[in-house]
From Swiss-Prot:
Organism: Arabidopsis thaliana
Listed PANTHER family: PYRIDOXAL 5'-PHOSPHATE SYNTHASE SUBUNIT PDX1.1, PYRIDOXAL 5'-PHOSPHATE SYNTHASE SUBUNIT SNZ1-RELATED
A cellular component term, taken from the record's GO annotations: endoplasmic reticulum
High-level lineage: Eukaryota, Viridiplantae, Streptophyta, Embryophyta, Tracheophyta
Protein name: Pyridoxal 5'-phosphate synthase PDX1-like 4
Family: Belongs to the PdxS/SNZ family.
Superkingdom of source: Eukaryota
Biological processes annotated in GO: pyridoxal phosphate biosynthetic process
């Protein structure tokens, strides 16, 4: 088997998956969707106001942001 594929063996069979490149139109579409701003993680109203002024399209109010959880040795989601 030549090339840039992935082979996964399940029991006595094998499933192959070739690496596909996203077309330019998909990349342009993603860039256009993200153009309006970002979603920011905040812990209080002051941070939400700062995020809004900086151009955030939305905020997520959390008890603790993932960066703080990781800094304290915890495990947090990765985005």
């Amino acid at each position: 088997m030549a090339g840039t594929g992935v082979v996964a063996v399940y029991g006595e069979g094998a499933m192959t998956e070739t690496k596909q490149k996203s077309p330019f139109s998909v990349k342009v579409g993603l860039a256009q969707m993200l153009r309006g701003g970002v979603i920011m993680d905040v812990v209080n109203a002051e941070q939400a106001r700062i995020a809004e002024e900086a151009g955030a399209c939305a905020v997520m109010a959390l008890e603790r942001v993932p960066a703080d959880i990781r800094a304290q040795g915890g495990v947090a989601r990765f985005c």
